[in-house]
């Protein structure tokens, strides 16, 4: 099973999600919507970072993950 890593930086107000190996990061591309895409050397997106992300509570953040079957045409 693939691994997804989620990091929240309270000091930097960023939420970072990796679904590839962070060590494979070669280039970052800002989308203009306060989102930075992290890509490997082949240009494949392996993660993203949401800038100016503020948690609304001091409680630990819960992360829900759900697999969705989009079906085949």
What do these predicted regions represent?
Residues 1-73:
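Small, basic N-terminal interaction modules of short regulatory proteins
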